Amino acid sequence: MPEDKVEAIEHVESSRHDATVNEKAIADFLNAEKEMTTWQAVRAHRRLLLFAAYRVTHLAILPFVCASNYGYDTVSNGSSIAMPAFIMSFGAMNHATGSMYLPSIWTSLWTSMTNLGQALGSLIAGFLAERIGRRWTAVSLAILSIVGTFILVFSSTRGMLLVGKTMNGAVVGGLMAIGTTYAADVAPIKLRGALLQAIVFFGVAMQGVSLGIVRAFILDMRPLAWKIVFGIQWAFATLVLIAAFLVPESPVFYVAHGKHDKAQSALRRLHGSSDQYLHIRYGAIVHALDEERKQQSESVSWAELFKGCNLKRTITIGFIMFSTSAIGVPFLTQNIYFLITVGLNVTSVFDIGIGGFFLGCLFVMLGWLSNEGIGRRRLWLWGLIGNFLCMVTIGALGFSTTKASQLAIAVIMNVLISYGVYATVGVAWTICPEISSHRLRQYSQSVAFIVGAVGGWLFNFITPYMYNVDSGNLGAKTGFVYAGLTVVVAVISWFLVPETAGLSVEDIDRAYEMGTAPRHFKSAKATVSAESGH
């Protein structure tokens, strides 16, 4: 049985009629691919997954470099404000205590404008990617990153720093929209989840590296310390440029623009397989886009996201991305500053945080082995349950002021970050590209990151007002607020979030068009397959 499935993928026969593929051949191909286990898919697509091979760079390097850029920027942007050298350069003097501090208005602006920059970058990336392609959009963003990083490194005023942070925020928002779209475009069904999870892995790994670099310079009082932290982003911009010139353009983009010869050439570079296999996969893309066009107008526009069954898809994607902030991710990402305010030693806080990020990498690798079996929807709901329990525990520990309680809060917050990478944030980054239709995927992903960035801006802005002593003064009891919001998200998710694991684009399209309840997507697909004889 396993050998038969692999053979079906590697040597499936095509029915050629003037370079066309009939629907039965496509259906047989997709069903053979969906029925494979993850290990069988790895064997069948081993060229894509051998990292030392030239062809795998085509599939993986662009999304992974985009994720690495995102991971490094998000943490360096937030944790650098805790560096004494940074505070000495951009802080103000508290004459009553004789100490330096960062004015609240500027810390809020740096955080919020970075998030809004991400939203703007996602919007622009969606517009450009549908006109000039995924690759050239990535090149444009990399050039913008070089300029933005230059402004950061040579900033002499808070306003100049704000401009640089906003520009780089736009870069990372756009790159993540491009990276996830590209991965979803080119990945085989059974490897789609693993590759999207790998994007999460690279992002989390770079967050840990970023925190480690900040930790290495935390006691360095020279301005050069924070300049180095920001300047490293030049390396990531260069990697994006290299990756963009190594990879082929998305074959989905080429087919959507009628460039069929280029689409087949891109598929050959990506998969390097037999003519029969490439002909079937090319036919599957053409068929999927044709079916979507039958339901919609020929031209692709932002307005289509809010029409018919696409509206429910857009609402679902936006809800999932917004929820990652609503359940407390901003509270967790501010844990370094928060834990310092409750009395923990600054180096201890950084060390625990670094350990937490690399624990997150282990959780992501666990996801590679288990996500297809567990399913996206079930894992998302489990993640919300775990988030609720941890937030309640953090809130309860807020009633104690002992050192042991403070350490327990630090450990739980970092474990929850790692668990969230696996079960909530990781699932969000995986499922949102899958919910999108082929034609609207880039637009959908841009909307996803716009909504996610707005949610991040909102909760990053209000969270300090919850726990700071000069406002809400909740301290760790802020966990109760996010526990309550998690319950709300879980209830809505039960009715709105679908299961997409193992489903093709056609399966998901059909489920939305038929008005199938999201929680029944998997069973509805099985029923349709049984009735059609596949």
Curated annotation (Swiss-Prot):
Pfam families: Sugar_tr
PROSITE patterns listed in its UniProt record: MFS, SUGAR_TRANSPORT_1
Localization (cell): Cytoplasmic vesicle membrane
Membrane topology: Multi-pass membrane protein
Family statement drawn from the similarity comment of this UniProt entry: Belongs to the major facilitator superfamily. Sugar transporter (TC 2.A.1.1) family.
PANTHER family for this protein: PLASTIDIC GLUCOSE TRANSPORTER 4, SUGAR PERMEASE, PUTATIVE (AFU_ORTHOLOGUE AFUA_6G12040)-RELATED
Name of the protein: MFS transporter fmqE
